[in-house]
Amino acid sequence: MLNLPVDTRGLVHENEVANLKALAEFLKETFAVNYAKGQQLKTSTTAKGYSNTALLDDDLKSYWVSQSKDPSPTIELLLEKPVEVNTFMIQEYLPLGQRIKSFSLEVLRNGAWEKVYEGSTIGNKRLVRFDTKAVEGIRFTVTDTKDRAVFSNMGLFKALN
């Protein structure tokens, strides 16, 4: 929801309109290419009847579920070739509740994993921004959860600076 003030004419000021158009263009360009699509995806575990392919199908009604015995569910994405990125996106499947308490994100560079972020809660969608790096892969690890991890979508993007 946007809280846009109107001016004395009852209109949104031209400067506000220009800023909104710039924001729309930024978002359109940032999320135009999901570098995760078509890449090798591995998960630490997958519950019976589910598939990790749900993470990249853009369908908010499909989802991946970790096994109940997995204390730190991990999603690993290995890229065919290094690509410059700076934004990771993950979405919990909220009809089953918000479950994630904390997580970490690592990038694979020159054959070694490097932690770039630690965070708490995800909810509907979490965008994690980090310094632009040419990466060979990413690893997302749930470090604390209320129940099994359940995610509907993920992505890897390059936002303009």
Regions found by a protein language model. Name each.
Residues Q98-N110:
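Short, surface-exposed beta-strand/strand-loop-strand elements in extracellular ectodomains
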